[in-house]
């Protein structure tokens, strides 16, 4: 079971481009909280606190957002918008969650063991970066780890080959190809030396 990350938030009274830019210049990230049966709430969180929490707890962490009146919102990050030119987070969307109700969340793959493939002059081709999974918020993994160190040329890894954590399900096609491994051609080997 994951820990819950605590983040302080402030309400946003204006959602204009200029107001959001001013927030970012003052070290805040504009965002929204949304959920079933509620109106979206415009908020801002401190950028450095959010980045620290993501680094410590992971992208799929459960957050407890606390406003200036000590009202708490249990949320998960639904979307992180990154400004392409400066590669910085520019906006956040949080989804209100109940810790006792299953949710659907996108989970990224973390590939380990690539150095073994490189030592065998094998090339890894990743077809899918993430998949949607369902489960209770605290059971959603930060990432799904895939060890490719024992794969050989011609091997494929299908979604059905990945063991999901207990309590986690997915409606992804079991035959979905996640990774393939191939040997480098002679020309590619010569070029890499």
From Swiss-Prot:
GO molecular function: 5S rRNA binding; structural constituent of ribosome
Keywords recorded for this protein, A-Z: Ribonucleoprotein, Ribosomal protein, RNA-binding, rRNA-binding
Signal peptide boundaries: none
Pfam families (alphabetical): Ribosomal_L25p, Ribosomal_TL5_C
A GO CC annotation given for this chain: cytosolic large ribosomal subunit
SUPFAM superfamilies given in the database record: Ribosomal protein L25-like (SSF50715)
GO biological-process terms attached to the record: translation
The protein's assembly and partners: Part of the 50S ribosomal subunit; part of the 5S rRNA/L5/L18/L25 subcomplex. Contacts the 5S rRNA. Binds to the 5S rRNA independently of L5 and L18.
Function: This is one of the proteins that binds to the 5S RNA in the ribosome where it forms part of the central protuberance.
Family, per entry: Belongs to the bacterial ribosomal protein bL25 family. CTC subfamily.
Name of the protein this chain belongs to: Large ribosomal subunit protein bL25
